[in-house]
């Protein structure tokens, strides 16, 4: 997947193992998981659809979130950083929201600086898995 709002990679581990690895790598960078949305499970329950595993993890680093909220109180509409973990073929795809791309919507240099720092941490997370 190539786009301007996320970066990611495909790994050989299953979805469960990948979520564990992602969660551990996020913790090393100061992030916790605020939400875990089972998209495939929800669509199965609500629409009767059988889809491959698809989870959205809402990751947050409290220090960066606090700085961003101080710079722009409405920025909460763009938080937390979403990490998608989904089944693809024989592997698992991990895509992470690019905070620099998304936070450019705010148009404040101090927010862009924070987003750049967060992006670096999230890129290290991707490198760990």
Predicted regions, residues:
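Residues at alpha-helix termini
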Residues: 28, 45-46, 128
């Amino acid at each position: 997947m190539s786009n301007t709002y996320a970066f990611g990679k495909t790994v050989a581990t299953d979805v469960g193992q990948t979520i564990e690895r992602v969660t551990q790598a996020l913790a090393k960078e100061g992030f916790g998981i605020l939400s875990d949305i089972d998209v495939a499970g929800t669509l199965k329950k609500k629409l009767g659809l059988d889809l491959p595993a698809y989870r959205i993890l809402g990751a947050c680093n409290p220090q960066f979130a606090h700085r961003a909220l101080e710079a722009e109180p409405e920025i909460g509409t763009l938080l937390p950083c979403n990490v998608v973990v989904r089944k693809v073929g024989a592997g698992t795809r991990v895509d992470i929201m690019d905070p620099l791309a998304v936070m450019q919507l705010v148009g404040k240099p101090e927010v862009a600086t924070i987003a750049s720092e967060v992006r670096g941490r999230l890129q290290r997370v991707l490198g760990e898995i």
